[in-house]
Amino acid sequence: MEKYITFAVEEHMTGQTVEKVLRTALGLTKRQISRAKFQADGIRKNGVQCRTTDIVQTSDQIIICIEAAKNDLNHLVSFCGDAHPLEILYEDEDILAVNKPAGILTHPSGAHYADTLSNQVSGYFHKKKVSCRVRPIGRLDKETSGIVLFAKNQVSAQRLQAQRESGILHKQYIAIVTGSFSDDTSASSNTAWHTVCFPIRKTADHPLRMEAITAFGSSFVPESADFVTPLVDMTTLLSAVTHYQVLYSSPDWSIVTLKLDTGRTHQIRVHMKALGHPLLGDTLYQKTFPADSLSEQPVFHRTALHAWKIQFRHPFNNTWISLEAPLPDDFCNCFQNINFSL
């Protein structure tokens, strides 16, 4: 599969070589550029094939052909089952955004080799005769529902991942948590955003569980492992920053929306637990309580977390794209019971 990228040279790039522009402005690798320059019309400037050493001027139009390498082709087992039909939120020639249901993994892992969201996307590409690798940009936990973004080519993947790391690409989540924020007058405001900066590490007693280190206060973010304490091994800590806003709070449970500056494993679940508000249905981070003590809480048979919104720039035309994943039935039922709407 071939992909043509068109780029207009900007004024500050005048005097640079074609190769430098392709590498700095488009983020292409030397291998991608080398592969293109040996094709007929693989790299063109103003409609004419050019050399990578040619000098560019303002408003020159550069077109490069990116050919999929062998390892770019789809290699996953295609899964086309009806249990979780693929819900597409957005698609063009470079990206695909889908609404992941709770209960399936984003990508094959362990015993789940053919029944994941990526396998479904693979089957969808196969059905449409699109030969490209399945590239999820970030992942959601198995029990988390919501938006998952896929890149259809390597350049899109590189650029979207760079946006994710720089914070240009960001998601907003909805969660239902235990307990009330009403005792905390600052956190109970439905207009204010609050920040949690507890560092996170793996626990020693469970292969999947993470924990937040609260010994230094919520504003602590480790800069290095040079600081030593007898209680905490600093080399195991990962900085983690979560922003949250309380949308609704009752005596037994609350609704919050969250944004992340970092993407650590289980970050939202761990930070909410550290605040004393573990997510409903989260059996990994919440102790089991007697049934009668949960009578005022909604019943969730999975972790009550939904990746609600995403915003990013298109990897090629740079326009902003904002998407929203419809709430799943368990969230809708919960909100309807209290006449709450987003």
Model-predicted regions and their roles:
Residues 1-342:
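RNA pseudouridine synthases
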